[in-house]
Curated annotation (Swiss-Prot):
A Pfam family reported for this protein in Swiss-Prot or TrEMBL: Ribosomal_L19
SUPFAM superfamilies membership: Translation proteins SH3-like domain
Cited InterPro entries: Ribosomal_bL19 (IPR001857), Ribosomal_bL19_CS (IPR018257), Ribosomal_bL19_sf (IPR038657), Translation_prot_SH3-like_sf (IPR008991)
Purpose of the protein: This protein is located at the 30S-50S ribosomal subunit interface and may play a role in the structure and function of the aminoacyl-tRNA binding site.
Entries under NCBIfam families matching the protein: rplS_bact
An MF annotation (GO) of this entry: structural constituent of ribosome
Stated family: Belongs to the bacterial ribosomal protein bL19 family.
Native species: Listeria innocua serovar 6a (strain ATCC BAA-680 / CLIP 11262)
Keywords from the UniProt entry: Ribonucleoprotein, Ribosomal protein
One of the record's GO cellular component terms: cytosolic large ribosomal subunit
Protein name: Large ribosomal subunit protein bL19
Length: 114
């Protein structure tokens, strides 16, 4: 039974996901359905967490929009993500970057890996 679940799960995984970690700046091209129309919505920000494994793996992206912090959680292997681009690699020493919620302006910057 376990092998069957593993095979089904493996067939649902998206092989086109680039490697990314917390601290990286990513641009997510998410498919949004509005009525009968479907369009692509961009969401660019810093990955503040990545959790889970396999088909249930998710990541959270944080950005500042009009002075307000916005966080959005995406499943890694969802067909609703048309494309996932890594814009820059960040150097952090934590797996969960919740401390960024309390920082403003230049204090919230993350060093880039060269």
């Amino acid at each position: 039974m376990n092998k069957l679940i593993d095979e089904i799960t493996k067939s649902q995984l998206n092989p086109d996901v680039p490697s990314f970690r917390p601290g990286d700046t990513v641009r997510v091209h998410a498919k949004v359905v509005e009525g009968t129309r479907e369009r692509i919505q961009l969401f660019e920000g810093v990955v503040i967490k990545r959790r889970g494994a396999g088909i249930s793996e998710t990541f959270t992206v944080r950005k500042i929009s009009n002075g307000v912090g916005v966080e959005r959680t995406f499943p890694v292997h969802t067909p609703r993500i048309a494309k996932l681009e890594v814009i820059r690699r960040g150097k952090v020493r934590r797996a969960k970057l919740y401390y960024l919620r309390n920082l403003r302006g230049k204090a919230a910057r993350i060093k880039e890996i060269r």
